[in-house]
Amino acid sequence: MPQLLHIDSSAELHNSTSRDLTALFAQQWSNNSPDHTTVTVDLHRDPLPHLADAALHYAPRLRVEGEIPDPAAEALQARVIEQLTAADVVVIGAPMYNWSIPSTLKAWIDYVHVLGTTVPFDTRTQPLAGKPVVIVSSRGNTYAPGSGNEANDHTVPPLVQVLGVSMGMDVSVITAELTLAQRIPAMAPLIEQGDASLRAARESLTELARTLGA
């Protein structure tokens, strides 16, 4: 049965744009067929501990003498990686926090990006190559091409580098911009533009869920 891994990281539990959008994708995915299943991971409600040992960055065969991570931490990493490899499609809610990603999502990245296991190092193996991953990023301002603000987006580019370039996954990026226009009076003239960005994000996610779940 096709499986979706649905990951949220927003600290906002009741009015989150990224959560709403990943939920839309997951619902549309499920609508494709009763055989479609979803595994949901909430990194805010159930955060991973920060990586306990730098040795976990490497496959066991690449560790130097004396690098012996705690077996419990190693087992946790294995479970997180297995959850990712078992999925046919992945959707990740990655809201922009201080121009970067939530620390909970960074912790997850540190668990799954492992030289010699999920990332080529001494071999050319890329077990996640070609697996579709949809990055859903909400942001208070605009960082679109031509905005003059592109260089300040440290949310999407690192995820594309890790998941797409390093791990070989097939990355799609959907953004919903200007979410602060509803909150900050000085940004009120941008409300309509923000609403349009949200509508476009919803339309794109609906279509992606349909095509990836076909």
Curated annotation (Swiss-Prot):
Its EC number is 1.6.5.-, 1.7.1.17. FMN binds at residues 10, 16-18. Binds 1 FMN per subunit. It comes from the Bacteria. The keyword Oxidoreductase applies. Coiled coil: none annotated. GO terms for molecular function: electron transfer activity; FMN binding; oxidoreductase activity, acting on NAD(P)H as acceptor; oxidoreductase activity, acting on NAD(P)H, quinone or similar compound as acceptor. It catalyses: 2 a quinone + NADH + H(+) = 2 a 1,4-benzosemiquinone + NAD(+); N,N-dimethyl-1,4-phenylenediamine + anthranilate + 2 NAD(+) = 2-(4-dimethylaminophenyl)diazenylbenzoate + 2 NADH + 2 H(+). InterPro entries: Flavodoxin_fold, Flavoprotein-like_sf, FMN-dep_NADH:Q_OxRdtase_AzoR1, NADH:quinone_OxRdtase_FMN_depd. Its cofactor is FMN. Pfam families: Flavodoxin_2. Keywords: Flavoprotein, FMN, NAD, Oxidoreductase. Quinone reductase that provides resistance to thiol-specific stress caused by electrophilic quinones. Belongs to the azoreductase type 1 family. Homodimer. PANTHER family: FMN-DEPENDENT NADH-AZOREDUCTASE 1, FMN-DEPENDENT NADH:QUINONE OXIDOREDUCTASE. This is FMN-dependent NADH:quinone oxidoreductase. It comes from Rhodococcus erythropolis (strain PR4 / NBRC 100887). The lineage of its organism: Bacteria, Bacillati, Actinomycetota, Actinomycetes, Mycobacteriales. The gene is azoR.
